[in-house]
Amino acid sequence: MNFNGANIPLGEDSRLEIAPVNSVVSAALYGDIDEVYTDLIVKGTGTPLTYQNLAALWPYLQPTIGGRIFGNADAPLQWVSNNGDVITVRAAAVTKMPDLILGVEKPGIGPVEFSGVVGNGLDPSASNSYYTIATGQAFSAPAVAASSIPRQKYMAAWGSAAGFSSFQAQDAWTITHELKLNPVKIQGRTVDMKITSYRAMAKCMPAEPTMANIDAALLAQGAAAEHGAKLSSTAADLVITGAQTVSVTVKNAALKTAGFVFGGKALRNGEIGFVSTINTSSGTATAALALA
């Protein structure tokens, strides 16, 4: 896969879906009698293999709310096969950033979703206004360094809360994204999308913190848990660092959820969840997530 010049090797099979959106034509006497072609968004999904091309795969970590993700210049997305088949989506953008699964036994990176709209200044009735299909094209296999595949041990640190200064997940950390997009339509056809919100979440089953540590840090009961208290009142950066590469920081992270497990095999701690909070005190919104 190649997106706007970034070569992205994939760890699994990828998909490209072309599904036109139609509006049903109905008549009182005859029921649904036809359909009218109204819109098309080309959807592409794939699972990146390597922790590279950070700006291309995770472009909205500190977004401008109301910003257009397709913009005025088309960013091409290509599927390039070793048999010479090439499909090029003319105007593409990331619409679902990959989750991160940080651990030794996990793949490291989840699926990314791209969406394609009609090219700038083009009418859908024009040939190749959304995508092109070619065969017999030259293929060059990408170089993949094992060091860029992020399977390794990770340690975490969260503020000054007791038990959280240095801890690890029992299995793996999962970093997810709450990205909200609003389509921009002209006469029913999607021509762009605008960012309306973004937050980052992180969850794991921690090994080291005690039940008392987790209870004290969670805004659930006690002096800090006054009715109406803001999560940001207990927030601090959550920094997750790999033994060789990869650093993930959930900015101004607040502990939002927690649980405990009881049984003969399980460790006591269940899953805990952090969410980013956005500091706007300077007049500029801080980033929700930082990757390095």
Model region roles, listed by residue range:
Residues 1-292:
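Signature of extracytoplasmic/envelope-associated structural regions
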